[in-house]
Amino acid sequence: ASRGQALEGYSPLAEVELTASTDLTVPVQKFTAIPEGAQQLACYQDGALITSLIYTIPAEKRARLGEKLYSFGSVSDVHIPTNDGDDFRRALAFFKEYGCSFVGISGDIANDGSEAQLQMYQKIIAPYEESMPVYVSAGNHDAQGGGLNRTQWEKYTGHPQQFMVEEPSSGDIFIFLGDNNWPNSSNNQTVLTMAQINWLAEQLEKYKDRRVYLYQHVFLADTCGDVYDAAGNPVYGVWFRPDRAEENAYRDLMRKYNNVTWFSGHSHWKFHLQSNNDALNVFDGDGEYCQMVHNPSLTVPRDYIDGKRIEDSANSEGYIVDVYKDYTILRGYDFENGQYYAYATYA
């Protein structure tokens, strides 16, 4: 809040049931950032401010970020032709109006990897080709049915399966690493090949003194990107498995290079489900790993209700990322209702 008014354009930080004379603790994810302009924490009931429940944020805790260097949009799991691509069009228009320099997508632009779907993707991004490039890493849906068709992929996305881009104003490095195959039922059908991982290792070593943003679709087990049930069991399967050599090699790179911020996707889980698993959206294993960020789905975010996975094609989620000299600020965004999620704003 600011001066007793809810911060414009943001969701509540939390919604809780208060009982008189009872203490209540509201957990906050450790990477949570105080939005710029916020001066207070305030409680509201039915839209009305409770004046006895206002906390002034100390001046030294308020956001002082300095000059913004650039911004980019970050989304995942577009799954064209879901919703006829309208969610994708709306997101790109929003990113353009916001002033994003480019957009990163962490996989699954096509629902079944067909040429027709890739053609539709190309048509949607065409108006932004010069002013706001769209970069994408292939996901499992893009690579199904015999593996990624690299010729078609490069033709319609404009980029190879793996590539890097340097942001000119900062020297920051963006690496995009595409999935190799789906399904992954044998040793010859791997999410990533060892050749890809060796290429990635070369890039990370080369740019170890730079800020690096990595896009790769499938998250690692027991890190970020998944929701857990009450017994602590994962409810979304991941075949990038710890019993595979390529997974181990990739995981070691995520441990070694803490200058990396890795954007994954794949599970579609909504931002709010971090209430089930604190590590769902952002995770670093208390410093064991680089910073890992999970992008929810732009077109079919998934909810988890009464132990069941629910597809919600009426919603649409992603990130605005603002980059400063000393900070990267991620703000989860609700494209359907046009607001930032205060509980999914991270540094």
Per-segment meaning from a language model:
Residues 74-76, 102-108, 133-140, 177, ...:
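Active-site neighborhood of phospho(di)ester-bond hydrolases with catalytic His/Asp-centered motifs
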Residues 40-44:
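Extracellular recognition modules
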Residues 10-29:
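Aromatic sugar-binding surface patches on proteins
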Residues 60-66, 310-347:
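A short C-terminal boundary segment appended to hydrolase-like catalytic domains
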